[in-house]
């Protein structure tokens, strides 16, 4: 998980292995820990930082309570924080799930950006889908993050300069 990504990079990357390690992957489940990404970025600038898994799990044994806007805010917060601290790529674990939040072999059913109801044969695009879309639509492949700031900690923001010279700001 993210809180140990710096420690793990220090353990894995040395003079012998530095040419064999292209990046480090992490998950988001233990909290923000954005400062650990910044530490990896500063001490290992050549490494890719890859958020390789994240999802919003339903509480086990409880009715599937969906707070779609809260989940969308969680995604936006994580994407902005990770980008602002050196992340190179971000992957969701479950982009598309069924109406139960599965299928899943261990019973940890999840909410997802796209939910397909196999009973009614309908597709629902959740707010998480649109949050992910805001980043992918405006921050293009090959973009470089540029500095930005916010007047309030309640307004999170990131910015990047795209290869065509345009600047994308995502709030």
Language-model regions: role of each:
Residues 51-133, 146-150:
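Aromatic/acidic polysaccharide-binding cleft in carbohydrate-active enzymes
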Residues 36-39, 77-80, 155-159:
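Generic recognition of flexible, low-complexity loop/linker segments
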Residues 19-22, 44-48, 85-90, 141, ...:
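Loop/turn elements at helix/coil->beta-strand transitions in domains of secreted/extracellular proteins
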Residues 32-33, 139-143:
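Short amphipathic alpha-helical segments with coiled-coil-like heptad repeat character
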Residues 1-59:
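Active-site neighborhood of glycoside hydrolase catalytic domains
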Residues 16, 28, 86, 94, ...:
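Sec/Tat-exported extracytoplasmic proteins
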Residues 137, 148-171:
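Carbohydrate-binding surface patches
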Residues 4-8, 102, 154-158:
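Short, solvent-exposed polar/charged micro-motifs at secondary-structure junctions
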